[in-house]
Amino acid sequence: FGPSSQDEGSFEFTEIGLNVSLRPHQDVLLAAQMLSRRAGGDSSDAYPKLDYGLIDYQMVSDQQRTFGIQLGRIKNPFGFYNQTRDVAFTRPSILLPQSLYFDRTRSLALTGDGVTLYLEERLDNGVIRGQLGLGKPQADKDLNQTLRLHRRPGSFEPQQSAIAQLRYEDD
């Protein structure tokens, strides 16, 4: 990454996270993660910030199905890797394919502040998983710089948006 192929390595790609997960009741999960990340650029973009922070309430959880709701800053169900893109061993490479997971505008696609409903239905031959979310996407300074919005009059303010994902996993 960066000048590592020309020299003896590089510290231009660094990630460190601190997460906490607490289950105050068998149906309730509180979880949060602070993340400091730098992918090229200067060290000023490595300040820690809230990656996700949520309250998860499972209304139904048994052998057949799981149904719940999450409130807070939630990872968007976008593509295969977005929800786990900051977990190194879930990535196929150091950086995800940039055609889908563009790191320069990652704040817009990564998380949103809002609510998500989720369902997991276990069938005889597989599992159906679905998520439906409503929230306000994050728009950090990386988005304004990448899209060169600081050169234009006005401002970029994200609006409420919806996102959904439906998956089937065969046994």
Question: Which residue ranges define each predicted feature?
Answer:
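Surface-exposed strand-loop-strand hairpins of Gram-negative outer-membrane beta-barrel proteins
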Residues: 1-14, 145-152
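Outer membrane beta-barrel
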Residues: 7-140, 166-170
